[in-house]
Amino acid sequence: MGKTIADILERNNIPYMITFGTLLGAVRHKGFIPWDDDFDMFLFDESYDKAMEALSRELPSDMFLETKDSEPLYFHGFSHVKDIKTVTACAQFPHDGLYEHKGLSIDLYRAVRMDEGLLDKYLITEHIAYLGRRFRINSIDKNVYEAKVKELETQLHDLQIKETGKELLAMALAERSMKIEHVFPLKKISFEDTEFYGPADADGLLTAFYGDYMQLPTVEHRVPHYDNVIFIEAQ
């Protein structure tokens, strides 16, 4: 799936990079982390819509582009590509089970370039919007929703916003941001038997994300994303 998506993006001159556990796997394991079956990509805000158009047009029939336009119960702040030949279960993220398509998923995160002084405002605003989408589809209790939104609106009101002139890359709902110099210029990095685009400074980015990222986690923290995967035979 990842190779198919990357081929479409590269053919349409749309920048992307592997990130999070996928990037960590590429550097530390030269591919998938043995206990991690997830796949993560960053797309960039200025070309995100173009990427969705290209994927919608060119993905094969056994993959589904899950967006706010194609999934009625959509609540994420980013899109996914789902494998329709599989069905998964994930106790860690039970709300994902609300979606019609429950197959293996590739996350297409949206990286937004902004002044670092605007980061907190952006993250709080996006969190409020996320809770609103969850509330709209009845996946969050009304009292919990109202209490969380009130708390976030108070934080937003109390912010001291001052632009610094220094830019970074942010992602909605993530506690991490990325330094521009860690990301650009993008460069190819090996993953299993394929090369994907990754950041300019993978070591710097992974250190910022995870600290001593070459140190393996303890056995109890080696938890797969999916609890179960069922492969559907072709009809």
Show where each model-derived region lies.
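Short hydrophobic/aromatic beta-strand micro-patches
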Residues: 42-44
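Active-site nucleotide-donor binding segment shared across nucleotidyl transfer reactions
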Residues: 6-39, 48
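Conserved catalytic core of two-metal-ion nucleotidyltransferases
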Residues: 1-12, 55-116, 137-209, 216-235
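Short, conserved charged micro-motifs
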Residues: 49-53
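A contiguous, mid-domain pocket- or channel-lining segment that forms the substrate-recognition surface
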Residues: 127-128
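C-terminal, low-complexity/hydrophilic appendages and adjacent surface loops
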Residues: 123-124, 181
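A short secondary-structure junction signal
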Residues: 117-123
